């Protein structure tokens, strides 16, 4: 099975990097074939082109319409703030896979 690409975008990067680490650990544990990467929101239009799903950190939720416009054929969603706040790697991974 080909790996799916889950790309997270945010403004700061620190908490998203931690979330990516937790998501990767859960993907490995449950053998979910994904590649998970984090980028600054300024690269959404460029990097998002190769993603299977694009997730935005809650702090840039206001950018959702703009990024959906840049990536009209991609699922683009805002990460649930509760899952993001708890750095719930499994919860965010499940939501990402469901969106693909």
Task: Indicate residue ranges for each PLM-predicted region.
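Short acidic active-site motifs
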Residues: 42-44, 63, 88
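N-terminal glycine-rich "phosphate-gripper" loop used for MgATP/nucleotide binding
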Residues: 53-61
């Amino acid at each position: 099975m080909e790996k799916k690409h889950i790309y997270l975008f945010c403004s700061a990067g620190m908490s998203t990097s931690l979330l990516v680490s937790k998501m990767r650990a859960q993907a490995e544990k449950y053998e979910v074939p994904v590649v998970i990467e984090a980028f600054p929101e300024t690269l959404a239009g460029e990097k998002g082109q190769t993603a299977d799903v694009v997730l935005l950190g809650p702090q840039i939720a206001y950018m959702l319409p703009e990024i959906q416009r840049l990536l009209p054929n991609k699922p683009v969603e805002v990460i649930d703030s509760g899952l993001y706040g708890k750095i719930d790697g499994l919860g965010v991974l499940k939501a990402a896979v469901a969106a693909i």
